[in-house]
């Protein structure tokens, strides 16, 4: 980190502030998330194939949807389900995200409003070898049909329907 810190301050020019953001602050924030375990696997399986990545209130909706569907931790392990709880959605810490995605065939991103996590996740997985890259769905499915709307509040029932469709 620079000796004078990373914070925005007067009379720094906007380009100097942007340089600090892109050269230091984003990497420091990602490392903070990694070291403090802000993003974590909440449910795991020994042979995962389907993952759900979620953040905020949507995490509670996912957990309620799974409970409503009768998917307990042992059932999740048996059917190959992995759930990843994101505590800090931006910037999305890539190392733990890659560990989560390892071995998955498909990832369902469940988040409300804007696609903050989904956009970062697809960017982080883009350079995976094609055979190892999981399909990412969320607001839309793999052929562009609406799956989880970003214009309405998600409910456990909506999330359950999205999960069941997979």
Task: Enumerate the predicted regions with their spans.
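Flexible, low-complexity linker and terminal segments
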Residues: 1-166
